Structures are given as structure tokens and as C-alpha cells.
């Protein structure tokens, strides 16, 4: 009787994960059936990949990782595959750097990600397990190179989970952590659901962005918990000095998320393809370096428009609100001259922020455009910011009602060159 109950429980569990994921055939490929040990010592790469390939051959289905630690080099997911990580399962990236082959990724030299899919559709990663990139040795290498003082001494690091030119993607329930670099990257992909996941990395781990949609569209991110070393979300669409062509990121909703350590919710700075129709609502920031941040500069910009934020609360966030066409600096010099408008000049406009509360900030922030491309149509409603320093506005058109900035030092709202401000 107990055996029958266990079989019924397993069947119900698998039925539930199928219902949650994009439609797949009902094949179940348990990686243990293909030789996986799950002991944290044996490399299970071949077994996991064999399970993926077998499921694909059957028309799709679930690749199942039951409780255990599966040490692995990179694996590649295929169409109609649900990689399901049971509670207590860990897919652990190999710490052997030689296991990550060199590839051209995002037009640049890179290393293959631990989990990736390319030109695939109906792909999901679900469950209550963990994907761990074992990034510690990569971070140490990155710090060593940075501290060497040798300019241009970059060495590529792998991302953790990448969807490249994919459609109909779901990530649900899992924890993603300790990536060598960016953690979850949809690249030129479409129709993506990211819900109820955690993305984690130590606060000072370099470049460990949580979620970085890159030239991707129709994305729904909800109940994301991010506690990382860089951007909690960074929406991107094209690198600095991009030769083009670049595609925008657009039609993205971000709701009911919590961000702890990290650099906040960002659009940019690599935004050479532009970004439109992005909405964030009910976001809680606690101790991030930044809150809302839209950033670009003269060598990586494009049209960034129809952006809205609603019901945002922040506690002990260093910079509450940054909208800057002068990244990485927040404020330009007083004598900043106009420059010729090019294909990569940023154009920020039609940005709305409703109901934002921030307490304990070091700075209320800045809204800073370029003299040749002033920011237009920023509308603020019901902003209540308490900070050591106020909000600086230059080369920008800002209007709104119910805006209260309390600054312990200096002006609450400082208007500099090119500021057109109508706040009540």
C-alpha cells in the first residue's frame, strides 16, 4: 500500500509540474536512469545531457533531478524540455574552468553557460531545487585581474543560465545562485515567464546580476527575490560602441518583487537597441545600492520610453532614483558641452513614477540628461523621499504632483542647467 501511495504521489507531482510548464509531452527521463550519481563528486554531465537528448527524441518531457547534488559541466536544453529539480536537488557547476568551452556569446568571446538553450521553444526549468554556479574561483580571478592594474586584462567568465533566441520560456520555483557572472539571461528571446524564483550571490561578488533580459520581449517577472552583488534586474539591448543592428527590449512587466543587496532595478547601461513599454509595480528595495536606475551614455544609448513604476517602497537604499544619460557618473561637469547626435545617443522620454516611498537614503538621486538630448516627459506623482542629500535635475523636463523630498543637507530639489521643472 505504501508503494502505491508513493507512486501516486510521484505521479501527482509530475502532473503538477507539467501543468505549470509550457506544454510538453509526458515522457519522464530521470537522470539516474542514464547513469547520474548525484553524489556531488562524480561529474554527471554526460548522464544529464543523455536524459535531455532522450526526452527530446521522445518528443519532449521532463528531465528529472531528484534529491542529490549533481556536479556538472555545461548542459544544453532542447525544445519541449522541462528541467525539473526536486526539493533537495542541486545542479552544481564544475569548479574546473577547463570544463567551460570558449564560444562566441552575445557577439563577443565568452564561455559556455552551465545551463543554456539556443533556438529552442517550450523550455522550462521548474521545481524547488538549486542551480549553483560555484562562482567563487571565478570571482577571485576577476578581482585579481582588476587589482593588477593592467588595462584590458579581461578574462571571460561564464553566465549561469542563458536562453539564446528562444521562445516560450518558464522558470518557476527554483533558486539560482553563485554564478561566475550574470545569472539568468534571456538573449534575443520572446514570451518568458519568471515567477517565484530566488537569485542569490554574496553582496560583493562581481557582476552577479540576477536577471538580465537582453534584446528580449514579452517578459513577465513576478515574485522574484534577488540578493546579489550587482543589478537585481538589468534590462539591456546592445553594448557600448555597438556596430548594430540592435533590437530593443520591450513589453516587460515586473511585479511583487523583493530586492536586498544589489544595484537595484536597472534599464541599461548597455541599451543601444532601446527599451520600451516596461512596467514595474509593487517592488520592495531593502539595502540596495540603488533603487530605480535608468542609465546610458553617448556610446550605448537609443530610445528608452514608455516606462512606468508604481507602488515602490525603499528602505536604506543609497540612491533612490537615478535617470541618467551620463553613466557611469551620476552628475556631469557644470561646463558639459553639447555633442553631435549619433545613432547611439540616448533619448529618454515618457517615464512615469507613481507612489514611491524611500526612507534612509544617502541621496534622493538625480535626473540628468545630455544637452544634445534632454530627458523629456518625466512625470512624478506621490513621491516621498527622505535622504541625506536631495534630488538633482539637469537637462530634463520633470513635472508632477505630491512630490516631497526631505534632505538633511542642501536643497531638496536642485535645478541645474537645462532643468525644466513643474512640481507641486
Placement of each model-derived feature along the sequence:
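Extracellular/periplasmic carbohydrate-active domains that bind, remodel
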Residues: 24-424
Amino acid at each position: 500500500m505504501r508503494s502505491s501511495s508513493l507512486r501516486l504521489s510521484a505521479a501527482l507531482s509530475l502532473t503538477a509540474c507539467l501543468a505549470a510548464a509550457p506544454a510538453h509531452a509526458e515522457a519522464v527521463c530521470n537522470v539516474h536512469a542514464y547513469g547520474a550519481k548525484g553524489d556531488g563528486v562524480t561529474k554527471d554531465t554526460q548522464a544529464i545531457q543523455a536524459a535531455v537528448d532522450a526526452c527530446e527524441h521522445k518528443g519532449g518531457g521532463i528531465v528529472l533531478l531528484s534529491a542529490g547534488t549533481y556536479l556538472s559541466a555545461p548542459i544544453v536544453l532542447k525544445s519541449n524540455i522541462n528541467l525539473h529539480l526536486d526539493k533537495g536537488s542541486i545542479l552544481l557547476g564544475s569548479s574546473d574552468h577547463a570544463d567551460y568551452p570558449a564560444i562566441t556569446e552575445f557577439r563577443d568571446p565568452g564561455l559556455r553557460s552551465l545551463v543554456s538553450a539556443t533556438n529552442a521553444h517550450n523550455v522550462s526549468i521548474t521545481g524547488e531545487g538549486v542551480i549553483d554556479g560555484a562562482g567563487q574561483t571565478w570571482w577571485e580571478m576577476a578581482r585579481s585581474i582588476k587589482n593588477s592594474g593592467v588595462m584590458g586584462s579581461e578574462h571571460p567568465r561564464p553566465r549561469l543560465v542563458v536562453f539564446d533566441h528562444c521562445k516560450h520560456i518558464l522558470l518557476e520555483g527554483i533558486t539560482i545562485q553563485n554564478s561566475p557572472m550574470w545569472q539568468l539571461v534571456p538573449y534575443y528571446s520572446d514570451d518568458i515567464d519568471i515567477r517565484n524564483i530566488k537569485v542569490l550571490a554574496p553582496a560583493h561578488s562581481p557582476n552577479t546580476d540576477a536577471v538580465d533580459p537582453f534584446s528580449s520581449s514579452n517578459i513577465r517577472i513576478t515574485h522574484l527575490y534577488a540578493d546579489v552583488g550587482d543589478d537585481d534586474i538589468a534590462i539591456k539591448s546592445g553594448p557600448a560602441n555597438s556596430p548594430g543592428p540592435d533590437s530593443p527590449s520591450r513589453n516587460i512587466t515586473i511585479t511583487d518583487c523583493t530586492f536586498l543587496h544589489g544595484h537595484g532595478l536597472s534599464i541599461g547601461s548597455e541599451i543601444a537597441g532601446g527599451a520600451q513599454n516596461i512596467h514595474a509595480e509593487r517592488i520592495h528595495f531593502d539595502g540596495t545600492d540603488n533603487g530605480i536606475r535608468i542609465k546610458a551614455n553617448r556610446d550605448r544609448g537609443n530610445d528608452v520610453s514608455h516606462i512606468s513604476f508604481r507602488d515602490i517602497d525603499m528602505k536604506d537604499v543609497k540612491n533612490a532614483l537615478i535617470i541618467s544619460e551620463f553613466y557611469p557618473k551620476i552628475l556631469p561637469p557644470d561646463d558639459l558641452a553639447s555633442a553631435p547626435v549619433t545613432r547611439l545617443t540616448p533619448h529618454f522620454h515618457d517615464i512615469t513614477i507613481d507612489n514611491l516611498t524611500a526612507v534612509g537614503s544617502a541621496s534622493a538621486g538625480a535626473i540628468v540628461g545630455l544637452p544634445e538630448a534632454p530627458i523629456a516627459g518625466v512625470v512624478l506623482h506621490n513621491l516621498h523621499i527622505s535622504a541625506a542629500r536631495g534630488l538633482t535635475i539637469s537637462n530634463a523636463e520633470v513635472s508632477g504632483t505630491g512630490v516631497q523630498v526631505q534632505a538633511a543637507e542642501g536643497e531638496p530639489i536642485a535645478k541645474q542647467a537645462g532643468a525644466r521643472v513643474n512640481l507641486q
